From Swiss-Prot:
Residues 1-237 form the Peptidase S1 domain. It catalyses: Preferential cleavage: Arg-|-Xaa, Lys-|-Xaa. It comes from Astacus astacus. The lineage of its organism: Eukaryota, Metazoa, Ecdysozoa, Arthropoda, Crustacea. It is an enzyme of class 3 (hydrolase). This is Trypsin-1. It is found in: Secreted, Extracellular space. SUPFAM superfamilies: Trypsin-like serine proteases. Trypsin I is one of five forms of the enzyme known to be present in crayfish. This protein is more acidic than mammalian trypsin.
């Protein structure tokens, strides 16, 4: 997250760290969001090329805030199955969404909780909050503490003006400030973009891609969750 501030424990109870384990060490590489006790939502490009039926060495951590400290609130569960969207396009990042089936159930509390989905076809508006442990500048360092930043949503028309009409699909939603300086970045991928224009918080986007990070005139591009609600409900079973 570029231009963000530290979150506090329990502020984003739906945020997950999606990690790879290797020789006893765990490495954060993407974000994810809690859908229910047994499923998480992340980006397709975070899992592309993995063994979807029998993934090994993948885990999610819920209730995490500071990666360098054991807060006692963490819940770590391995990923038992990956459900990648059947129309995911790795080159164009169309339909950049996947589900992670967990090998056990999360226990919900003040620090670990699901995030609601919008109605299928809902158009999010206003300001949104994006969170993650990704780099705090383009090509920069990663923070220990979860970062948050608030940015306004950008219309599809404006985003197509910025990137080109052939780059922004209906399955995408854009957010950012015109002058740059606030954005998601490498390592935030798969994580949540939360909106609340309905009066309660819901998952509006999944961190997907962008031209660099926080560059003027190039908003962050996210998977539009309202485009995929029916798919999520049909596959998280």
């Amino acid at each position: 997250i570029v231009g963000g501030t530290d979150a506090v424990l329990g502020e984003f109870p739906y945020q997950l760290s999606f990690q790879e384990t290797f020789l006893g060490f765990s490495f954060h590489f993407c974000g994810a969001s809690i859908y229910n006790e047994n499923y998480a939502i992340t980006a397709g490009h975070c899992v592309y090329g993995d063994d979807y039926e029998n993934p090994s060495g993948l885990q999610i951590v819920a209730g995490e805030l500071d990666m360098s400290v054991n807060e006692g609130s963490e819940q770590t569960i391995t990923v038992s199955k990956i459900i990648l969207h059947e129309n995911f396009d790795y080159d164009l990042l169309d339909n950049d969404i996947s589900l992670l089936k967990l090998s056990g159930s999360l226990t919900f509390n003040n620090n670990v909780a699901p995030i609601a989905l919008p109605a299928q076809g809902h158009t999010a508006t206003g300001n949104v909050i994006v969170t993650g442990w990704g780099t705090t500048s383009e090509g920069g360092n990663t923070p220990d503490v979860l970062q948050k930043v608030t940015v306004p949503l950008v219309s599809d028309a404006e985003c197509r003006d910025d990137y080109g009409a052939d780059e922004i699909f209906d399955s995408m939603i854009c957010a950012g400030v015109p002058e740059g300086g606030k954005d998601s970045c490498q390592g935030d991928s798969g994580g949540p973009l939360a909106a609340s224009d309905t009066g309660s918080t819901y998952l509006a986007g999944i961190v997907s891609w962008g031209y660099g990070c926080a560059r003027p005139g190039y908003p962050g591009v996210y998977t539009e969750v309202s485009y995929h609600v029916d798919w999520i409900k049909a596959n998280a079973v």
